[in-house]
């Protein structure tokens, strides 16, 4: 079982059920995709690397469904982490943070690699 601060992620006893529920969630609109992303974050299936892997996972869904990826380099660390903390109650803040930073540069290596670099920065690694 994993916790961060005062937040406990999904109990490991129920991880299979939680992941099955996440898999069944719709992902046809931006709103549905973000809702699915929030639930996957709550599932938190790994001991390390959840944030980084789920951001890549989110971009793969966005690319497949909407032809977009997130330009993570444009999203402030503090604002993003606060939006993620509050997203289980309401994902509106997260949607408003991510949506204007979507790009159609889905095959641009610089956007992808800068996003991975930013992802490490969100997790506490220095740039």
Predicted regions span which residues?
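FIC/Doc superfamily catalytic core
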Residues: 1-127
């Amino acid at each position: 079982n994993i916790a961060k601060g005062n937040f406990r992620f999904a109990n490991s006893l129920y991880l299979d059920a939680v992941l099955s529920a996440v898999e069944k969630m719709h992902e046809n609109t931006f709103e549905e995709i973000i809702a699915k992303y929030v639930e996957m974050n709550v599932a938190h299936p790994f001991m390390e690397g959840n944030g980084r892997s789920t951001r890549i996972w989110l971009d793969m869904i966005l690319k497949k469904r909407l032809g977009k990826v997130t330009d993570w380099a444009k999203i402030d660390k503090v604002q993003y982490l606060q939006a993620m903390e509050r997203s289980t109650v309401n994902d509106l803040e997260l949607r408003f943070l991510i949506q204007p930073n979507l790009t159609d540069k889905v095959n641009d290596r610089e956007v992808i690699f800068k996003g991975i670099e930013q992802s490490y920065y969100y997790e506490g690694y220095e740039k």
